[in-house]
């Protein structure tokens, strides 16, 4: 039997209210949250581990942990923040456990985005072959440099740049003050800027 569509949960309900239904054992409410956040979680995990199969598995594990931890959820906590805390902890553990296994060639520009199915890095037909090659090189370098950041900086950049989360949301997920979050992102972006400028100057 298919789970509930998004329209079956009244829009007036917040995610926190839906999660309270999950807390009481309402499986249809849990299915609703999975449907709503699955693409987002797969996209986040893909950007953290750069492996499509691992991203799917990690996203599934996030939701398993959400269900197993449902009794500990407090409605005072924003569901999105609680969800990303679970996801970031899982991503950090996965990165630690697989740091010697990650091949360099996992980043591919022609792979569809794990969240949207789009290929945003691919240039349009108006670009010359040389421009396309330069764009591919630049995007590969940016992704490579993001991947090389310290884990907390990388996580903050991914949430800020790709998940479109603001400073307050990132701060809540990472249990930092907003000023500390801004400093963390500033250092990360400054490192990326310096590395990319150095790369350009060598060419």
Question: What are these language model-derived features?
Answer:
Residues 23-24, 50-51, 63-78, 97-99:
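Sigma70-family region 2
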Residues 43, 57-64, 77-89:
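Structural recognition of an alpha-helix C-terminal capping motif at a helix-to-coil junction
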Residues 36-39, 47-50, 139, 158-165:
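Short helix-capping/turn signature of helix-turn-helix
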Residues 8-9, 13, 114-144:
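Acidic, proline/glycine-rich intrinsically disordered inter-domain spacer in sigma factors
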Residues 34-52, 69, 146, 191, ...:
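Amphipathic, Lys/Arg- and hydrophobic-enriched alpha-helical face
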Residues 71-75, 85-107, 135, 198:
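Arg/Lys-rich amphipathic alpha helix in sigma70-family domain 2
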């Amino acid at each position: 039997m298919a789970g509930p569509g998004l329209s079956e949960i009244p829009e007036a309900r917040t995610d926190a209210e839906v999660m309270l239904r999950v807390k009481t054992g309402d499986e249809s409410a849990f299915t609703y949250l999975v449907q709503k956040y699955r693409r987002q979680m797969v996209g986040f995990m893909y950007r953290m581990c750069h492996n499509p199969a691992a991203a799917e598995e990690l996203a599934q594990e996030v939701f398993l942990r959400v269900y197993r931890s449902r009794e500990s959820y407090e409605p005072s906590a924003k569901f999105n923040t609680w969800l990303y805390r679970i996801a970031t902890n899982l991503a950090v553990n996965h990165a630690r456990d697989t740091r010697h296994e990650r091949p360099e060639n996992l980043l591919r520009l022609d792979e569809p985005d794990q969240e949207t199915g789009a290929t945003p890095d691919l240039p349009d037909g108006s670009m010359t072959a040389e421009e396309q090659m330069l764009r591919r090189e630049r995007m590969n370098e940016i992704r490579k440099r993001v991947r090389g950041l310290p884990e907390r900086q990388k996580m903050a950049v991914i949430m800020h740049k790709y998940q479109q989360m603001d400073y307050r949301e990132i701060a809540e997920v990472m249990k930092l003050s907003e000023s500390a979050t801004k400093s963390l992102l500033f250092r990360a972006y400054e490192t990326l800027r310096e590395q990319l400028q150095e790369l350009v100057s060598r060419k």
